[in-house]
Amino acid sequence: MSCSKAYGERYVASVQGSAPSPRKKSTRGFYFAKLYYEAKEYDLAKKYICTYINVREMDPRAHRFLGLLYELEENTEKAVECYRRSVELNPTQKDLVLKIAELLCKNDVTDGRAKYWVERAAKLFPGSPAIYKLKEQLLDCEGEDGWNKLFDLIQSELYVRPDDVHVNIRLVELYRSTKRLKDAVARCHEAERNIALRSSLEWNSCVVQTLKEYLESLQCLESDKSDWRATNTDLLLAYANLMLLTLSTRDVQESRELLESFDSALQSAKSSLGGNDELSATFLEMKGHFYMHAGSLLLKMGQHGNNVQWRALSELAALCYLIAFQVPRPKIKLIKGEAGQNLLEMMACDRLSQSGHMLLNLSRGKQDFLKVVVETFANKSGQSALYDALFSSQSPKDTSFLGSDDIGNIDVQEPELEDLARYDVGAIRAHNGSLQHLTWLGLQWNSLPALPGIRKWLKQLFHHLPQETSRLETNAPESICILDLEVFLLGVVYTSHLQLKEKCNSHHSSYQPLCLPLPVCKQLCTERQKSWWDAVCTLIHRKAVPGNSAKLRLLVQHEINTLRAQEKHGLQPALLVHWAKCLQKMGSGLNSFYDQREYIGRSVHYWKKVLPLLKIIKKKNSIPEPIDPLFKHFHSVDIQASEIVEYEEDAHVTFAILDAVNGNIEDAMTAFESIKSVVSYWNLALIFHRKAEDIANDALSPEEQEECKNYLRKTRGYLIKILDDSDSNLSVVKKLPVPLESVKEMLKSVMQELENYSEGDPLYKNGSLRNADSEIKHSTPSPTKYSLSPSKSYKYSPKTPPRWAEDQNSLLKMIRQEVKAIKEEMQELKLNSSKSASHHRWPTENYGPDSVPDGYQGSQTFHGAPLTVATTGPSVYYSQSPAYNSQYLLRPAANVTPTKGSSNTEFKSTKEGFSIPVSADGFKFGISEPGNQEKESEKPLENDTGFQAQDISGQKNGRGVIFGQTSSTFTFADVAKSTSGEGFQFGKKDPNFKGFSGAGEKLFSSQCGKMANKANTSGDFEKDDDAYKTEDSDDIHFEPVVQMPEKVELVIGEEGEKVLYSQGVKLFRFDAEVRQWKERGLGNLKILKNEVNGKPRMLMRREQVLKVCANHWITTTMNLKPLSGSDRAWMWSASDFSDGDAKLERLAAKFKTPELAEEFKQKFEECQQLLLDIPLQTPHKLVDTGRAAKLIQRAEEMKSGLKDFKTFLTNDQTKVTEEENKGSGTGAAGASDTTIKPNPENTGPTLEWDNCDLREDALDDSVSSSSVHASPLASSPVRKNLFHFGESTTGSNFSFKSALSPSKSPAKLNQSGTSVGTDEESDVTQEEERDGQYFEPVVPLPDLVEVSSGEENEKVVFSHRAELYRYDKDVGQWKERGIGDIKILQNYDNKQVRIVMRRDQVLKLCANHTITPDMSLQNMKGTERVWVWTACDFADGERKVEHLAVRFKLQDVADSFKKIFDEAKTAQEKDSLITPHVSRSSTPRESPCGKIAVAVLEETTRERTDVIQGDDVADAASEVEVSSTSETTTKAVVSPPKFVFGSESVKRIFSSEKSKPFAFGNSSATGSLFGFSFNASLKSNNSETSSVAQSGSESKVEPKKCELSKNSDIEQSSDSKVKNLSASFPMEESSINYTFKTPEKEPPLWHAEFTKEELVQKLSSTTKSADHLNGLLREAEATSAVLMEQIKLLKSEIRRLERNQEQEESAANVEHLKNVLLQFIFLKPGSERERLLPVINTMLQLSPEEKGKLAAVAQGEE
């Protein structure tokens, strides 16, 4: 509040009169001075403030106020002194320091005080633009001496603020002042990418001046023409941009002058054009921009002029826009660089968009306006008139570009709306999402019949923004979507259009455009709208300034409520109606069902908001209007009471359309029928016609034909209603969503269809389909008739899929029915083939090469669906080359694989079926036929689905290649044996032809079994009667280029399981980190029962993607709990394998109804009860009861052998000795090789068995490792050995092969079982498996290159998974280096030890250095599992000193690493090898359970062996897992059996006796392979002993010659309890007895005679014990997992607190260092600076050289 001098005097007098003392009066002086300061009486104010200072001299406010008074009087010296005194009294006044610096620089820059105060202010305001300007003034006064410093200052400022226009201009001016024009031009080039600079008028002016000056300097240099042309190109672009900005911000005169300068530049460049180069392309584009800006300038003149002739100006402007629009788009390929191409492309789109819209704008409402303009002004006189209107100078016209340009060839070309829409999308990018530009475009489209493409515009600007949100009720900024922004733009355009109409109604000429050009028109949106749009763009593109984000979010959040019409939105009802109608119209024009549903759904949302307002208006009540609305209210468009009924009808139509889109057809029909309007009639006609089409897609019965007719009649009735209403009232035509012509065309088509039905249905005759010109008759109407364009109809939901989708579905259904029928027919043929010598074949039909006319292409697609169907049964797919067609071959050839039965297949498509001629003569499946047997042609196979196969080939003779049933394995050797002269034959009878030996071994073994069970298709290869017969038979030889691979069966992991339960649910997982439930997936939850072991598991896959989201066993310890607050959800905990590894998860399943939830609970409990009732899975359950005892006994003997083999593999100190014991007897032919060699990747040797099958069971007792199937004895005269090493006699089904990868999940475990049978199908000799022909490769493969890792000659002494970190000195913190296995390796030769670590998967080195004696490991502060050390590392190839840290998961592993690290240092000094540590044999994460649990389970599952003779052999098999874990250790993990024999095992577990465990070997034993001896049995004379030979790293195992010496340690171990154990492995025709040592103190339990019932009882009791232990183990594992999760959370919290503490300490250190350095800089050289040297050296960790330099600086030497 200001006061006058008189008021101040009265107030001062009253106060002084009441003051008791002069001092009291003086203390009021400050207040008096302020009163006089407001009255602008500065002298009186100084008087009173001085009296106050005399009393209160220490008041900094008074000194500051006095300085302000002196500054107003421009007394700078006294003002500075007062300010300085105020700062001394109160140093916190930072702004006053800057004020002093500004005053001193303003007064005298050369004053030394100015430099001091500027530097002081710079410390208080780092990076401030004001400080930069002050420093710039200081350096400017130094002249040329300060240029280098000024250049450095500008560069540093540009690094901080690259968008600052002043700094960029200052740098260019500095270059120009120093005559460095090339550098100035280069700087202009660099800044062109900056959008902020391109939108600055000052910067573009600077660029134009710089480029012009540079071009003038280049004119004298004739040699540098390319540089001159490039600079001219940049100058033209800069002129165009500057012209645009000048038109927007400056007056008409300045715009005229710039346009004339632009004209001169174009004229200068025109003389230098030549050829297709970058300058020519740019010149052409700039010509268009010149004329566009000329037209905008003419309209700008009319906007700002008085007594304007709008007609003359608009006609000249139209001429300019016509020229600009008809300039062709530039050839982008001529422009170098992607940035330049994008820029020119965007400028061209912007030019075409603005020019095209202005042409439509100027010619609106004027007939032949453009034609008149061209005829009047497209000549010399018109060009002169244009020149005179634009340029005021008297320069000759011929020397200007505008005066000399040829404008006589202009066409009267109005822009097409489709082209304009495309140009608009490109122009959006040029304006970077400016709301002004978007609003201007919307206004142009507002007066056009088509809708604006706002959706496409927004997609260009916000690529990743969702189209619609599911949370319309919220106002969170994160929920904003494309539809919100589209609604906003529609509202801005709507209100802006109404405002322009109000202005034009008051004073507007008919020739004045409603909307002026974009650079000329005023702001079209309000400030509130602009600020909201800018805030949205900033948040979405994440460009918010730090600290400003919260403010922007509040702004966006407030307006979202308005846009979504939530709460008190304050929107005008007319705007809501406009939004609803526009969205409904846009949605109907989209092709996607989802887009339609979202747009029409938002339209329904606004209709629901406006209906209550319509009721208020109906009652003639007023609607409140907000004071400052987001969208201004216009009373000219207020809804009247008479319009309410029409709007309500539109709303209900929209509701019905949404029902139709969502698939609720019946509801939509009911709603449409209740509305009596042409829109509802049209929609009903569409629905009924669609129903008729749905029925017409299939073969119709009489009832269906009648129903189809009724639908067509209803369609006809509604179409006739539309035509009648339009005849009576022409206004209803505007409401139709389609043109009236489309209605008439549709009615005509419906009438034609009804006539077809009445004439006897020519489409359907004799129950078969008519071949309509060999084409598929589409059920959709023709586009030329009444095809509903996307903008005129709506699509249907998945409940009622689109027409093409239903046609596809019907086609697929038809194909499936055909395939089913064909399979049934082939099955019948197969069954008949076993009873009759004549083999049923499909009749064939022969089409010659000319059966299809040239140029004809069959119907390849059916609404986009390929018409390729498989017509044969076998599931091996091979593609046929398109060149192998009947029109290209002289005779048909077998171009498909033998499993395909057709060679020349031709499709004839009709509306609902195919006629497929099949020709395949001579290539047969099934039982062989006589060579010259005649076949009679069969009748065509007829079926209901329309497939027909006709035979016109007559009788065929010949013998074909047969796929027989006598062998289960088909090889090419069988084909080669065929010697028939007339049939199809592989190869030639040439002695040099080697045939197919070795190729295709077991080629069809996986298919023939299925072929026997499925259909066998027979067909003859086609032969012409006499045309191609030769004297000799054809000997066709195929030389395959690439052998086809075997077909890979798709395995989903559910093959051997039965589905007990399946229901669609929504699965949730509890996230312990955020303490909330998260959705896991939506799909079918299944309970599967394993057919082998009977264990149930729970499996769930997500819909569509089929990703596993739940996969775990159902155990008896699991219990279902209802989820709180819901009776439709159950919760449980399980060890889940869905992500590959076992992980304890809390899961919850939500069902649709409580009944479904209760059904799931019952099924779950039944599965748990099933677990308790599972019978013991022993071999006697799987064989006939008559041989149970023998089979049980022999299966146990076989398992005993595998148990011994496991003991050998798990012996940690086993060494193989070379022994050979010769004996007599017969054995199987062939041997198996075993090689043990060091593996650089693992810590132990790799055991390789040729022809072996070693599979693992992953320590899961749930999977049965063997199953025995026995056939009757009468059918098995020769028994086969089921267990052997290497190749045995014929028919062996069990062999050791390479080990498979570990199965970790239940789905994988399900596949690990091996079923062994003795059926006749397996009676295949090894010779049959190996025969086949040899193919000479056309392109030989390159030699195998062995990959060297650099660790070949090194011994792994430590290996474990860990996390490596590296200390980064630059940022002062630890950074993760990688996760992988860290190894300690020792070289065998020089005994050097190094640490190597590679990252997982990529195997990139992240640590590689030698361990030296001076290295030391230290624990990191706060944890004992992290070791820190410093080393010269070579991981990146170069030597680099690194500070490393490694973190282990467990403490004992960390301790082990420390121990080995220390041993490595000692070993290098002693030049000795390090002994590998036992704890490194396996990592903790690979161990399924603890050592104690393993020992208990092994003792529980101790097995028995017996000595038997070799005649009766049971079929048995087992699975063994071999894993290499250490250099000297080869371990095997064997699935623990589920049964034990004898009571000692149970007694051993549950009693308190301290008996030592029974073992076949000792971990410390050396010199034995298995830990026991194989000795020849004394009872057998025909046995041979085996031996194991080891040489170096390889050992060979011969199964028939094996002698293993027993270690002496074993003889003394286990209390001498284990002495002798014997077993035998049965062989075919001969047996080999292996003697094991058994305990001597008590007879072996398995020697006792037990009945079957006793065995079952003992097995049952032991199994229950084992199950109890398993349950305890699982509970312990679950508890451990929960504890580990809690520990993990605690550790993460501790790490977070430690990081926060480190960051706080680091920030404090940096602040302290900054203060010390500032003191050092400002102190005088000498002792004061030297006192700070130790602190700086310590904090910066300077090198000696750096310390010396700093000391010199401290003394003032530098």
Swiss-Prot record:
Signal peptide: none
Gene: RGPD4
Chain positions found as Phosphoserine: 21
Record key words, sorted: Phosphoprotein, Repeat, TPR repeat
Organism: Homo sapiens (Human)
Swiss-Prot/TrEMBL TPR repeat ranges: 60-93, 584-617
Cross-referenced PROSITE patterns: GRIP, RANBD1, TPR, TPR_REGION
Low complexity bias (residue ranges): 779-798, 1295-1309
Span of domain GRIP: 1703-1753
Region (Disordered): 761-805, 1213-1249, 1295-1332, 1583-1621
Entry keyword annotation includes Protein biosynthesis: no
Biological process per Gene Ontology, one example term: NLS-bearing protein import into nucleus
Acidic residues bias: start-end ranges: 1318-1330
GO cellular component, one term: nuclear pore
Compositional bias per record (Polar residues), positions renumbered to this chain: 1236-1245, 1583-1594
Ranges of compositional bias, category Basic and acidic residues: 1595-1618
Additional record remark: One of the 8 copies of RANBP2 clustered close to the chromosome 2 centromere.
Location of the RanBD1 domain: 1037-1173, 1334-1470
Protein name from the UniProt record: RanBP2-like and GRIP domain-containing protein 4
One protein family per Pfam: Rab_bind
